[in-house]
């Protein structure tokens, strides 16, 4: 029987859908990660970080999970914690969407909001402070550096893309939050399956820290509206050596593209999904990518952004 022991085991096997209004002659397909158990790509890493912590004895019954989140990883950790019987405290910048905050509280999270201007660095610092207050009680899973993050994408997301495209994938486009998706998928296809695809990282034009780092420039993070990517620093889980190209997208374009995905493709897409598709659409129309199969990761669905600029001016 196909019955899961708990909801954490139901991750993955999300569909690929060909876009009709983006790209060149149907060469852009999207992997809809909002079909995961708590409705985002982060379900994969939430489950695997908890599983691995249990396996290595770091996380045992009676201990409490702590981490910093911009929302989706927190929701993923929270659903896994609820399913497996753990208490959980999460820190999050106060600027994240109302939906994310309410979902976290609904899942039983002790939610600690941090100053929005300090971004994810501020949330991480607060999480570390909480853990330091009682190290025997708290376990911090550290999504930005935990190897279980890219590992699950190497074991699941990458092989799914390979299988569902019959190995014909040429380009993978993904926004960078923790760096786990693009790193794990690229390692799977390039190293395990042996195909030298083009790995494209997407970041906000307002906070182009990956581009600045690769160019040897001073890193100058900035505020933007693309929740879930552009943390303002280079995460340890981002393997820069496996990235072939970096594309920047501004917040307004990301928002407009996410709205187009809903209205023109019937795909409920969040803001970072809009950024990734905008980057892929731009690439797909270049001569060198015209005949390439481009797979884009759509991290989450639009319901998580009802109170944000994504739905500004849209009334029922």
UniProtKB/Swiss-Prot annotation:
Keywords: Allosteric enzyme, Amino-acid biosynthesis, Cysteine biosynthesis, Pyridoxal phosphate, Transferase. Hydrogen sulfide binds at residues 7, 35, 268. PROSITE patterns: CYS_SYNTHASE (PS00901). Its cofactor is pyridoxal 5'-phosphate. Its EC number is 2.5.1.47. Pathway: Amino-acid biosynthesis; L-cysteine biosynthesis; L-cysteine from L-serine: step 2/2. InterPro entries: Cys_synth (IPR005856), Cys_Synth/Cystath_Beta-Synth (IPR050214), CysK (IPR005859), P-phosphate_BS (IPR001216), TrpB-like_PALP (IPR001926), TrpB-like_PALP_sf (IPR036052). The modification N6-(pyridoxal phosphate)lysine is found at residue 42. PANTHER family: CYSTATHIONINE BETA-SYNTHASE. Belongs to the cysteine synthase/cystathionine beta-synthase family. Homodimer. This is Cysteine synthase. It comes from Haemophilus influenzae (strain ATCC 51907 / DSM 11121 / KW20 / Rd).
């Amino acid at each position: 029987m196909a019955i899961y022991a708990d909801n954490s085991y139901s991750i993955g096997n999300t569909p690929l859908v060909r876009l009709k209004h983006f790209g060149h002659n149907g060469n852009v397909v999207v992997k809809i990660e909002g079909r995961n158990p708590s409705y985002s790509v982060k379900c994969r890493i939430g489950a695997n970080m908890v599983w691995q912590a249990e396996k290595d004895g770091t996380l045992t019954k009676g201990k409490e999970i702590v981490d910093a989140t911009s929302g989706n990883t927190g929701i993923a950790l929270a659903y896994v914690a609820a399913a497996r019987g753990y208490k959980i405290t999460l820190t999050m910048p106060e600027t994240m969407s109302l939906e994310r905050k309410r979902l976290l509280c609904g899942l039983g999270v002790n939610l600690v909001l941090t100053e929005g201007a300090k971004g994810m660095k501020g949330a991480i610092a607060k999480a570390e402070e909480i853990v330091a207050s009682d190290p025997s009680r708290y376990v911090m899973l550290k999504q930005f550096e935990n190897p279980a993050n890219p590992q699950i994408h190497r074991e699941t997301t990458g092989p799914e893309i390979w299988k569902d495209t019959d190995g014909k994938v040429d380009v993978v486009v993904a926004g960078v939050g923790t760096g786990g998706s693009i790193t794990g998928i690229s390692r799977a296809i390039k190293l395990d399956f042996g195909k030298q695809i083009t790995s494209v990282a997407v970041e906000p034009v307002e906070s182009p820290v990956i581009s600045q780092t690769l160019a040897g420039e001073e890193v100058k993070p900035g505020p933007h509206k693309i929740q879930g990517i552009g943390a303002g620093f280079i995460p340890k889980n981002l393997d820069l050596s496996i990235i072939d190209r970096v594309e920047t997208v501004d917040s307004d374009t990301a928002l407009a593209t996410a709205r187009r995905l809903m209205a023109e493709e019937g795909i409920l897409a969040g803001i970072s999904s809009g950024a990734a598709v905008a980057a892929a659409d731009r690439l797909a129309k270049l001569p060198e990518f015209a005949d390439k199969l481009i797979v884009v990761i759509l991290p989450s669905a639009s319901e998580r952004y009802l109170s944000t600029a994504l739905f500004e001016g849209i009334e029922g």
